[in-house]
Amino acid sequence: MHYPEPISKLIDSFMKLPGIGPKTAQRLAFHTLDMKEDDVVQFAKALVDVKRELTYCSVCGHITENDPCYICEDKQRDRSVICVVEDDKDVIAMEKMREYKGLYHVLHGSISPMDGIGPEDINIPSLIERLKSDEVSELILAMNPNLEGESTAMYISRLVKPIGIKVTRLAQGLSVGGDLEYADEVTLSKAITGRTEM
């Protein structure tokens, strides 16, 4: 079907979002058309503001309005422990449980040779530099329990062991193939408490 150009552009834009196919994009585009103009302007401004006003922390890689982020700035945090996660949503999931008091390092992905993503394509080099300069005694690898997460954890473990830092992995209890961000607080709490050395 042929749509007016503004609708086609909007449908194409919505389809760039993960999990949004042509039918959902079409539904969202027509819903946007039915919205009040003020609401559409506010929505568009929120999209632009996310890109303009947020950055990544130069220390840990987490999204932030201020650099360094509030977690890295918090002097009450245990600076001897760093929890390595795949993305920002994992930090948010870990923070919800209110038990972990260390720092984070966000990789922004995982090693996936099938997708052409190698160690140099994610935030691993800055992690290694950070471990050499900070006084870290333990590195918790909190990758998602899937093939890519396991590969990433093994790769980091092999890199870090020679530095002499204890490397642990979250306890299993997380579903294999699942994502950390979808785990409930109790499961995450048990996984961090029961972590195992690699």
Curated annotation (Swiss-Prot):
UniProtKB keywords: DNA damage, DNA recombination, DNA repair, Metal-binding, Zinc, Zinc-finger
Cross-referenced InterPro entries: DNA_Rcmb_RecR, Hlx-hairpin-Hlx_DNA-bd_motif, Rcmb_RecR, Rcmb_RecR_Znf, TOPRIM_dom, TOPRIM_RecR
CDD domains from the UniProt entry: TOPRIM_recR (cd01025)
Zinc finger region(s), C4-type: 57-72
Residues annotated as domain Toprim: 80-175
Zinc is among the record's keywords: yes
GO biological process entries: DNA recombination; DNA repair
Record-linked Gene3D superfamilies: 3.30.60.80, 3.40.1360.10, 6.10.250.240, RecR Domain 1 (1.10.8.420)
Entry-linked NCBIfam families: recR
Functional summary from the UniProt entry: May play a role in DNA repair. It seems to be involved in an RecBC-independent recombinational process of DNA repair. It may act with RecF and RecO.
Family: Belongs to the RecR family.
Protein name: Recombination protein RecR
Lineage of source species: Bacteria, Bacillati, Bacillota, Bacilli, Bacillales
Underlying gene: recR
